[in-house]
């Protein structure tokens, strides 16, 4: 069982925007906290691949994946770094029909990535567990894709009303990875998600090539996201993320491990923490230590 962490956990949206610690500093902290692998962001891949390789070698880390819209440029870089997957971190879809559209798009991306030995995955939040025509949107997506994998964010799945071990077993050999995120409450998927065809729909990642933006513009974007997260609704979204193994946790991590072990390959685990109950690095170190002591 590989226990990794995403660079997203070191700054959240600020990390997407290339603000805060350098990539090497993040790698050093990740190593010191006890993790052995890392999931990158698009902005991380704006560094020269040879520099990233050097920093990985210096810290003893390996790359598993990147959270990015899968383009051939991104896929090539992930292959050069020895990674396993490019994970689409989310895109709007609100119905069975739109889920099928996304499934076909992901299959096209997967066909592009196959020659490079890279898998294409989709990462969920809670809204993908909205029901339409008898199934959740994420089930419609996977049922209509033959090449796409799931990176099941177990925290958002449980939060949205889906029992992760059930989902993993239903889609055996389709779970390339999981995001480890604690949860203490089932909230549900919310109202019908946004349509990908509404005005201002998907136009590519808002975080693509962010280093080309002036620092002031990036800070303005961050301030907007920070205001959303500090709103009453934003705080409510993350307050359900408790300490790993806490009494209030409603996620059965041991059963998740059993379900994953039934696959024909090893899925990689990525810690992604957005809610902090204590000092930032202590929470992440606790996550890593708890997994190693209780799950491996």
Where are these regions (language model features)?
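N-terminal pre-domain/capping segments
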Residues: 1-84, 114, 288-296
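Conserved beta-strand positions
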Residues: 5, 40, 88, 122, ...
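Tryptophan-centric aromatic hotspots in well-structured domains and transmembrane helices
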Residues: 8-10, 35, 122, 156, ...
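Acidic-and-aromatic substrate-binding clefts and catalytic sites of carbohydrate-active enzymes
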Residues: 13-18, 37-50, 67-74, 93-100, ...
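Active-site acidic/histidine proton-transfer and metal-coordination neighborhood
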Residues: 24, 28, 37, 62-152, ...
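Acidic/histidine-rich catalytic cores of soluble enzymes
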Residues: 115-244
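A short, acidic, amphipathic alpha-helical segment used as a generic capping/interface helix at domain edges
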Residues: 248-262
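Aromatic-rich peripheral "rim/lid" segments of glycoside hydrolase catalytic domains that contact
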Residues: 263, 274-296
């Amino acid at each position: 069982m590989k226990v990794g962490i995403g660079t997203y956990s070191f700054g959240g949206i600020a990390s997407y925007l290339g603000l805060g610690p350098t990539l090497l500093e993040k790698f050093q902290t990740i190593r010191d906290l006890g993790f052995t692998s890392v999931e990158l962001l698009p902005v991380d891949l704006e560094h020269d691949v040879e520099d990233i390789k050097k920093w990985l070698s210096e810290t003893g880390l390996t790359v598993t994946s990147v959270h990015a819209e899968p383009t051939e440029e991104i896929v090539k870089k992930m292959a050069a770094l020895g990674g396993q997957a490019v994970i689409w971190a989310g895109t709007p879809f609100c119905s069975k029909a739109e889920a099928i559209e996304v499934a076909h798009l992901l299959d096209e991306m997967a066909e592009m990535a196959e020659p490079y030995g890279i898998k294409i995955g989709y990462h969920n939040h809670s809204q993908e567990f909205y029901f339409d025509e008898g199934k959740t949107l994420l089930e419609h997506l996977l049922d209509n894709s033959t090449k796409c994998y799931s990176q099941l964010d177990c925290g958002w799945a449980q939060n949205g009303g889906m029992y992760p071990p059930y989902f993993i077993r239903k889609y055996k050999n389709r779970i390339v990875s999981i995001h480890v995120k604690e949860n203490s409450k089932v909230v549900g998927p919310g109202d019908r998600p946004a349509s990908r065809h509404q005005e201002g729909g998907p136009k590519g990642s808002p975080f693509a090539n962010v280093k080309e933006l002036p620092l002031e513009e990036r800070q303005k974007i961050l301030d907007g996201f920070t205001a959303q997260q500090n709103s009453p609704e934003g705080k409510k979204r993350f307050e359900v993320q408790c300490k790993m193994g806490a009494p209030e946790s409603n996620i059965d991590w041991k059963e998740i491990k059993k379900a994953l072990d039934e696959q024909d390959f090893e899925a990689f685990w990525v810690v992604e923490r957005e809610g902090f109950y204590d000092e930032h690095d202590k929470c992440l170190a606790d996550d890593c230590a708890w997994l190693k002591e209780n799950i491996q």
